[in-house]
From Swiss-Prot:
This is Ribosome-binding factor A. The gene is rbfA. The keyword Ion transport does not apply. NCBIfam families: rbfA. One of several proteins that assist in the late maturation steps of the functional core of the 30S ribosomal subunit. Associates with free 30S ribosomal subunits (but not with 30S subunits that are part of 70S ribosomes or polysomes). Required for efficient processing of 16S rRNA. May interact with the 5'-terminal helix region of 16S rRNA. Belongs to the RbfA family. It comes from Chlorobium luteolum (strain DSM 273 / BCRC 81028 / 2530) (Pelodictyon luteolum). Its main location: cytoplasm. One of its GO terms (cellular component) is cytosol. Gene3D superfamilies: 3.30.300.20. Monomer. Binds 30S ribosomal subunits, but not 50S ribosomal subunits or 70S ribosomes. It holds the Pfam family RBFA. GO terms for biological process: maturation of SSU-rRNA. InterPro entries: KH_dom-like_a/b, RbfA, RbfA_dom_sf.
Amino acid sequence: MSRRTEKVASLLQQELGAILEKEYPRGGPLLTVVDVKVTADLGLARAYVSIIGSEEQRTAAMEFLRDETKNIRHILSTRIRHQFRRIPELEFFEDRLFEQANRIEELLRSVRKDDGDNA
């Protein structure tokens, strides 16, 4: 990734995080924009979102993001329009790394416990 795309991705990550903090309904799952990947032509930004909540909440959150993509892009354009000629199209993807890390920690704890019982 070039320095330009890295800077754009970083700015989009910050701004999308702030937008989601204000726009996403309270009382739902915790949404965090963990990464943004931008194409070389800056025409498309893929935002990876970590969602902490139940399976139903995660599904609802992804539906919300996909349904509101156009509105989120519009809000984004009002916030950063002086820095870009064209605002990239947005795509949202769920990042389950946090969930996978918790599962690995649980497995490691159970292995340590089993080793302690067998000693």
